[in-house]
UniProtKB/Swiss-Prot annotation:
It is found in: Cytoplasm. It is an enzyme of class 2 (transferase). It holds the Pfam family RrnaAD. It comes from Alkaliphilus oremlandii (strain OhILAs) (Clostridium oremlandii (strain OhILAs)). It catalyses: adenosine(1518)/adenosine(1519) in 16S rRNA + 4 S-adenosyl-L-methionine = N(6)-dimethyladenosine(1518)/N(6)-dimethyladenosine(1519) in 16S rRNA + 4 S-adenosyl-L-homocysteine + 4 H(+). SMART domains: rADc. This is Ribosomal RNA small subunit methyltransferase A. Belongs to the class I-like SAM-binding methyltransferase superfamily. rRNA adenine N(6)-methyltransferase family. RsmA subfamily. Specifically dimethylates two adjacent adenosines (A1518 and A1519) in the loop of a conserved hairpin near the 3'-end of 16S rRNA in the 30S particle. May play a critical role in biogenesis of 30S subunits. GO terms for cellular component: cytosol.
């Protein structure tokens, strides 16, 4: 197959179609074959897999995925890329391209229509401005996929896998780790993209858990607690939770924190996901 991942080939395609990179869509195309191979390796793509690729660009990564997977559904928001993808992926009968915004799709319905009962994985080179909304859509909607392998800004990847007591630990860390096991696969320098982004990138794989990391009575309460606790990082738990969106009374908080064996003077950034689970469940009994 005619690979398009070299700088020369990519520039030829961009010039042929007079393609204009969109800053608002955060478009950067990969031009390093080793990185592309490493992404597909890291995603553990095998013959029986069905892959949803978000943001195929001109199809460089798509080609590599298609050579290993059973079938690929590429979701591209930019309609000006569709004719380019028809050319670059024309030799791959196992690839279907749809011009859609993944954030507006009913992903359960899509998978039921395209890949019923199949092993589905997601691979994406995401624009940095929509990284978190897209990832959380797959996680919160409990879309039936095995894993998400995503290229994102290094700082966001660091936050996703951070643990208690570290500067990167926050609400995003807990949200991602509630639904999945995150694993950083490789660092990607700006030099392997056209045009070069101003930030370093990281490829991270989120292996979706069969059941959430902790068992909670009310997920909404669990995540509201986490949000309030990290909303005022420098405050003690007692003060952060009593002045957050939940507007909890200090007397109730003292009772629930004591029952959870958590010191009221600790900060939210020191609690494990398990401790947040215990706290949320004890609070649920009182509300």
């Amino acid at each position: 197959m005619d690979r398009i991942s070299s700088p020369k080939k990519t520039k030829e395609i961009v010039q042929k179609y007079e393609f204009k990179f969109s800053k608002s869509l955060g478009q950067n195309f990969l031009i390093d074959q080793n990185i592309l191979d490493n992404i597909v390796d890291g995603a553990n793509v095998s013959e029986g897999d069905c892959i949803i690729e978000v943001g195929p660009g001109i199809g460089s990564l798509t080609q590599n995925i298609a050579e290993r997977a059973d079938s690929v559904l590429a979701v591209e928001i930019d309609k000006t890329l569709i004719p380019i993808l028809k050319e670059t992926l024309g030799a791959y009968p196992n690839v279907e391209v749809i011009n859609e915004d993944v954030l507006k799709l009913d992903l359960h319905k899509l998978i039921e229509e395209k890949f019923p009962g199949r092993n589905v994985k997601v691979i994406a080179n995401l624009p940095y401005y929509v990284t978190t909304p897209i990832i959380m859509k797959f996680l919160e909607e409990k879309v039936p996929v095995k894993s998400l392998t995503i290229m994102i800004q290094k700082e966001v990847a660091d936050r996703m896998q951070a643990g208690p007591g570290t500067k990167d630990y926050g609400a995003l860390s807990i949200a991602v780790q509630y639904y999945s096991n995150p694993k950083i696969l490789l660092k990607v320098p700006p030099s392997v993209f056209i045009p070069q982004p101003k930030v370093e990138s990281t490829v991270i794989r989120l292996d979706i858990l069969d059941t959430p990391k902790v068992s909670v009575e009310r997920e909404d309460l669990f995540f509201s607690l986490v949000k309030d606790a990290f909303g005022k990082r420098r405050k003690t738990l007692l003060n952060a939770l009593s002045t957050g969106d939940l507007k909890l009374e200090k007397s109730l908080l003292r009772e629930v924190l004591a029952a959870s064996n958590i010191d009221e003077n600790r900060r939210g950034e020191t609690l494990t996901i398990e401790e947040y689970g215990v706290l949320a469940n004890n609070l649920a009994k009182k509300l």
